[in-house]
Amino acid sequence: RSMCKDVYVFAEQRDGNLQKVGIELIGEARKLADDLGQNVVAVLLGNKIKDKASELIAHGADKVVVVDDEMLAEYVTEPYAKAMMEIIQSHNPEIVLYGATSIGRDLAPRVSARIHTGLTADCTKLDIDEETKLLMMTRPAFGGNIMATIVCEDFRPQMATVRPGVMKALEADESRQGEVEVVEVNFTDADMNVKIREVVKTAHKSVDITEAKILVAGGRGVGNVEGFKDLEALADTLDGEVAASRAAVDSGWISNDRQVGQTGKTVRPELYLACGISGAIQHAAGMENSEFIVAINRDEEAAIFDIADLGIVGDIKKILPKLNDAIKAVKEK
């Protein structure tokens, strides 16, 4: 354990594009590493991605460890887990952070099992304990009703996954200098336990709500599946995405990958339009860091108005179509 040092971040990329969550985690790792007097190291796995290292350094990494191989062109569990494991075994990190995305949620447990260390999933807060210097990993428990803080005293590295949108990215500083280390991993055909025949992109490029700049979110007040059509129309006009509260998801009006809140995703878009959402504390926890919040609700006492920058008391069924027409008219000018 005394050999272990530095805070490592799995810098997720898809199709050669760095994902926002990796940049956010480097910002958080910077704070943790500064508390420990250590460095931030980003791990970049993929194919023809080495040129992305400078972006990671600009956002706060001191060093980038790159594994560039054709076997890593698309995310496949086995080759990625092997690369990650070899880096951890040769570099001995103190802490490793992953985004709680479909990739991170697949990779992190696999790696933690192989190197025999713990993993705390879906953390919403990370701190270094002043006395023990251990990583304090906080996450919602019991359906989001309490927050539990977990420590990994005996094993290294200390590992956690963190949802996109929870941590704040640092502004890019292009003048920052850093080191890039290229690591060779000897992959064999046996590592490729999956054959990718083709990658099919969906026609409507639905963006992960944590990546969207504008979100039009609906709650119980939307009323039904039909009601979400008005939200979708407005989101299309604004080049945004549709999101929802737990009530709307539980009612089956929209898929759960659109859920914002303590048991859903945490988002910080530039604009969050809350339609028929009462603003329960669990929902607010997932969106209160949005840059600008507009709330539309019939109930003028709704808690959502307490955190909204702009509030409209009224019926969304009447307001949304008019709002959509007005925005379209402005865009056409």
PLM regions with names:
Residues 1-333:
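N-terminal glycine-rich FAD/FM-binding segment characteristic of electron-transfer flavoproteins
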